[in-house]
């Protein structure tokens, strides 16, 4: 498998790590009336990419480059994820990615990841073993941060798939810029609104998405 093919596979929404059941907070944003159409979805995605996307991608890039150990990165991710519900969602997806990695690269020792690493931590470890660069790993994390929420909003608001696809294409330069910044050093931004949305969603009865 070539590096480009591996990058595309890791960024594929069909990757069986459970990402399809997570909306990245957009379900709660829709329910709360904060995201109602393409314009407000665009604003939400930009905000999420610049904050949560940057932080997650920077942790992944640091793990990939070896500037953070898996254990240290796990602690750093906990510290940067105030909402317990968001930490749970991150570990659920990280567990799925670690499980897949053990099948795809069975010759590698994945013991350090443990059972349920945070998703950015697992992403960094997988990117390194897969032969990507830290920047490519960061881009994969930023891209899936954006597309996961975009696809969820499309379903929740019954948006035209073509319109949503065009919106995500338009955000490509932002994703590139954020990924480049993420590859430089771990970021420590936070967004209280996104934390509140994540926690409130976990307390809602019968949501469509897990987070």
From Swiss-Prot:
Gene3D superfamilies, per this entry?
Urease accessory protein UreF
Transmembrane portions of the chain: none
List, alphabetically, the Pfam families matched.
UreF
Question: What is the protein's given name?
Answer: Urease accessory protein UreF
Q: In which broad location class does this protein mainly occur, judging by the first location in its UniProt entry?
A: cytoplasm
Highest taxon listed in the record's lineage: Bacteria
Q: Where in the cell is it found?
A: Cytoplasm
Q: Which UniProt keywords apply?
A: Chaperone, Cytoplasm, Nickel insertion
- Database matches in InterPro entries: UreF (IPR002639), UreF_sf (IPR038277)
Q: Which family does it belong to?
A: Belongs to the UreF family.
């Amino acid at each position: 498998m070539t590096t480009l093919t591996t990058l595309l596979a890791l960024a594929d929404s069909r990757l069986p790590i459970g990402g399809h059941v997570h909306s990245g907070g957009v379900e709660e944003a829709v329910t709360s009336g904060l995201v109602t159409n393409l314009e407000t979805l665009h604003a939400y995605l930009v905000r999420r990419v610049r904050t949560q996307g940057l932080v997650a991608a920077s942790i992944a890039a640091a793990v990939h480059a070896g500037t953070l150990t898996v254990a240290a990165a796990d602690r750093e991710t906990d510290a940067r994820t105030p909402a317990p519900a968001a930490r749970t969602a991150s570990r659920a997806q990280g567990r799925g990615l670690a499980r897949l990695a053990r099948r795809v690269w069975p010759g590698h020792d994945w013991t350090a990841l443990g059972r349920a690493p945070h998703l950015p931590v697992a992403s960094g470890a997988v990117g390194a073993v897969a032969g990507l660069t830290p920047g490519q790993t960061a881009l994969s994390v930023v891209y899936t941060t954006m597309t996961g929420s975009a696809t969820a909003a499309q379903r929740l608001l019954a948006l035209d798939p073509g319109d949503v696809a065009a919106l995500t294409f338009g955000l490509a330069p932002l994703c590139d810029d954020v990924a480049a910044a993420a590859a430089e050093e771990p970021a420590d931004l936070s967004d209280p609104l996104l934390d509140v949305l994540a926690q409130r969603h976990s307390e809602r009865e019968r949501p469509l998405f897990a987070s």
